[in-house]
Amino acid sequence: VLIHLRKPRGGRRAAALAAAVAMAAAAGCSSASSAKQDESKPLEVWIRQDAGSPAAESAEALTKAFTKKTGIKAKLVAVGVTDFETKLQQRTAQKNLPDIVINDTGQLGNLVTQGLVREVDRKGVVGGNEIVDRAWEAAQGFDGKYYAVPFNSQAFALLVRKDWRAKVGAEIPKTWNDLTKLAVKFTKDDPDGNGKDDTAGMVIPGTTTRGYLTWWFSTMLWSEGGDFVTKKGDGYVPAINEPASVKAVKKLQGMFCDSKVVQPGASTADSATTHTVFESGKGGIYLTGPYMLPRFDASLGKDKYEVIAAPPGAGGRAALAEGENVYLMAGSANEKSQQKFAEFAASPAGQKIGLGVDNGGIIVRLPVNIKVDGTAERRDPRWEVFQKVYDNAGRNAPNLPNWSNFRQISSEGFNGVVSDCSRDVDQAMDELADEFDAELKKQGAKAE
């Protein structure tokens, strides 16, 4: 599951209006005392998965196991990936939220800002001390309080065509510059041996839609020592126009404009497109998550590609870390059972069901519970690469009131310099920093 973000620039004002409407609508269900408590009331559990999918089957198994263990009735609703946000806003307007929502860590700011979730007492969560700290960080709001219980984590690594690397006689890249050189070879040296100029070294989802370009570029930006914003006192200041950040963006622009190692149409490609590019043999290096392994094993062949950690840059080794949380929605008539569900989902029993070992429905990529060894359960050492990346280099998005706005704004800024090769990066990043500054003020997160 990829990040679920806001619409591109054209829809930002409309999205903001929708959020304001949602906030007003949620006011009636944001108070803990607004719903009379009834511990016999069944839980309604939402997950952002398509009905009938293996992932939905795993979520159904999780829900049934919870009921079997606790005696608490719960009904799973697999809400389609494409209309999840719409349906949630409809229920918000009706002041009738589901009890539980399993959704991205990146949505925490949106949900908190709109008053749709209630606070969680980390110390009061049974088994909470077994949940890794980095996962808890992704459940923490800008105010330092927790608004969810972690359920799933993931980090991103490089899938590299192993057979192509052997064909061009290249070593595993040790730096981002090495990675670019490998991408050049994959682009120019006919690694598939078909005699045609039809391969790309780097597969990049560069569209602004849902903030994909920022999602991809975060790992590279941080590795090169850059950042989006910098913590200063109780707030943040823009860092995207600092020298290290600008240097990283220039390298990104170079991939599109100088070495030209990206696939055709990269600046408008989303993940559905890039998945196809990689598995169809048209691209050689793809930064993505472990959830893609089953698909690529089946379509491309397990022997054709390898999993390696993204190399360190000038700033060391870093990789975007994400995941899903169990959100305890506001206005529930059964708050005690809400928390029990979240505790079960994060427990070893819940985590093992989420691994989807039996049915391939992977809703837990990397376990958040220290007592579960995902690699051992799956018996696939490639997952250990992702686990080590998460443990040693994983980095959550900045803890802002609403990070998704910054993700969208930055994606548009980055796309501007890769879509127009004549665009001056220094100037573009100064302009982006100004946008960040305005957004920080708007969110009340600007450092004094």
Go through each PLM region and give its residues.
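Extracytoplasmic/periplasmic solute-binding protein
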Residues: D143, Y147-F151, F156, T180-V237, ...
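Short, solvent-exposed loop/beta-turn-alpha elements that line the ligand-binding surface or hinge
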Residues: R118-D133, D192-G211, E224-K247, D297-L300, ...
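C-terminal lobe and pocket-closing loops
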Residues: P290-K302, G313-E412, K446-E448
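A structural signal for short loop-to-beta-strand junctions that line the ligand-binding cleft
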Residues: R91, P98-D99, G128-W164, T175, ...
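Conserved C-terminal helix/tail region of periplasmic/extracytoplasmic solute-binding proteins
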Residues: L2, K73, A166, N392-E448
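Conserved N-terminal structural module of periplasmic/extracytoplasmic solute-binding proteins
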Residues: L2-N110, R122-N129, S267, A314, ...
